[in-house]
Amino acid sequence: MKNYKMNFIELQVTLSFCVVFLLRMLGIFSVLPILSKYGLYLNGGNKFLIGLAVGIYGATQIVFQIPFGILSDRFGRKQIIIFGLFIFFIGSLIVVSTNSIFGLIIGRAIQGSGAISGVSMALLSDLIRKENRIKSISIIGVSFAVSFLISVVSAPIIAENFGFFSIFWISAVFSIFSILIVFFLIPSSQNEILKNYKKNIYQKKIKFIFNKIFFRFYLGVFLLHFLLTMNFLIIPYEFELSGLALHYHWIVYFATIVFSFFFLFLIVFYFKFHFFLKNIIEICIFFIFLSLLLFLLSQHNLICLTFALQIFFIAFNILEIFFPSHLSQEISINYYKGSIMSIYSTSQFLGIACGGVLNGLLCTFFNTNHIFLFEIFITLIWFIFSFFCKK
């Protein structure tokens, strides 16, 4: 009988990555609740440039994810992760050395160019056995939620008492701690560097990493975050119309996120996740479709909106854990893993960017019901495509 318990090394790697992701995401998320207010006080600050300062991080992430993945396949994942964290550290220092909105934009752009998400997931999948990857990614997923909740609560307090730039000093310190954790606590993968790397490998590599099976995951994570962004730019408005004051929204988000993670852990650790693994993508897409239908039919009813949001979060979190863990199992050639996981991360950021831009465009000409109808149509296309692209 196979041992599905995590061994000491797997637990150490998982917890180390948890801390690294927690510290890094605290530095990223902490800016969001305060930038719109304090950015106006910077030299040259205006709403457009503040929006650019927010978006430039995601733009450089999109640009550098794949190059970092290719470099990790060639030179090693651990070295590239440390290099990316150092770039994030440099970006933080650039921000605190200026009092200009343009310095903030440049610093945020450099922070984003340390694009290590895909490389980190590739190294994690190198070091964790297949049967334990879902558990490991689930635990790390919690660190994302925790970092978001801590950031939303603490960032305004820190900025009010210690100043706007204190957030970036904290980000710089967290980057150094993260580098030390990666260097001392996370081992290198034995197979992560291709010893006989040749130039003629690229043609085979491109054909391999863009095959139908992988494309299903690339498209899946793109649409998942596309729908998430589309929803969260209109759901707060729907909650306000239902009578829920803005300063109470966090309670609904907190409750639904916590319950969705509880549901996820129940599946992963007690039901072993495998009893409906074969059709998991289609099942979750169906529940996303159901949640969007409930949003459309809610008529600003608070209970209906909350229930729809809960269904959406459950399906979202299951796919958010399933996609990277199962994708890593599909990669039969280890030295392509960094490139594939980086394309996956790029698809994720592209989904967020496209969701935000298209939502802004649609909101200019249509109401929220039309947007929900558009999302339902996209979800149906996704379901059909996923069904026919099954392995």
UniProtKB/Swiss-Prot annotation:
The keyword Chloroplast does not apply. It comes from Buchnera aphidicola subsp. Schizaphis graminum (strain Sg). Belongs to the major facilitator superfamily. GO terms for molecular function: transmembrane transporter activity. It is a multi-pass membrane protein. It comes from the Bacteria. This is Uncharacterized transporter BUsg_450. InterPro entries: MFS, MFS_dom, MFS_trans_sf, MFS_Transporters. Pfam families: MFS_1 (PF07690). Keywords: Cell membrane, Membrane, Transmembrane, Transmembrane helix, Transport. GO terms for cellular component: plasma membrane. The chain crosses the membrane at residues 15-35, 48-68, 81-101, 139-159, 167-187, 217-237, 251-271, 275-295, 303-323, 346-366, 369-389. PANTHER family: MULTIDRUG RESISTANCE PROTEIN MDTH, RESISTANCE PROTEIN MDTM, PUTATIVE-RELATED-RELATED. It is found in: Cell membrane. SUPFAM superfamilies: MFS general substrate transporter (SSF103473).
